[in-house]
Amino acid sequence: MKNVIVTGGNGFIGSSLIKKLIEKGTRVVAVDITFHGNRLPDSNLITRIESGVNTSLVERLPVIEYDSFYHFAWKGVNGADKADPTVQLSNIQMAVDCANICKRLNVKKFLCAGTVAENVAFSLSHLKKTTGGMMYGVAKHACRIILEDYCKNIAQQFVWMQFSNIYGVGNKT
């Protein structure tokens, strides 16, 4: 790979991936709402864009050929926002916006972060009451289904990466 985009680039998973990518000489455009408390090393292979993720992001990205777009940005992974359906729905829209950016820039592959928490969606019909945190898993599950369908319709190569519980230095979830 020569050029990639990583949303959530200053987050736990995004920054870890970026460090591995630059070790291999890959140029990375790291997108995050803030680089305060920067987790990324100084490298001429990294371009930082401090921005939210929506369709207007495409205007801020360098116009080059991209091999992959890794989407790790997701609001409300802990705290009260994890149970807020409005926040979780905005995350799904953000992921669809990323798919549209990929299509517009002819990015070869769109990779999106999922979670083992998606599996809660399969138990919902058997429960009388849920915990607020289940909304996060349900939203991730819905996001995957929407993206699988949408990316097929726009002919965008798509990979859903379902992670288990990930731990390490700097993880705040």
Question: What are these regions, as identified by a protein language model?
Answer:
Residues 4-24:
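N-terminal Rossmann NAD(P)H-binding glycine-rich loop of SDR-like oxidoreductase domains
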Residues 7, 31, 69-75, 110-116, ...:
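SDR active-site strand-loop-helix element
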Residues 26-35:
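Conserved glycine-rich Rossmann-like NAD(P)H-binding loop of the short-chain dehydrogenase/reductase
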Residues 40-41, 79-86, 121-125, 172:
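Conserved catalytic-core motifs of eukaryotic protein kinase domains, centered on the activation segment
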Residues 52-90:
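NAD(P)H-binding glycine-rich loop region in Rossmannoid oxidoreductase-like domains
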Residues 69, 96-135:
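Conserved Rossmann-fold NAD(P)-dependent oxidoreductase catalytic core, especially the SDR/UDP-sugar
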Residues 119-120, 134-135, 159-173:
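Flexible, glycine-rich beta-alpha linker
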Residues 133-159:
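Active-site Tyr-X1-5-Lys
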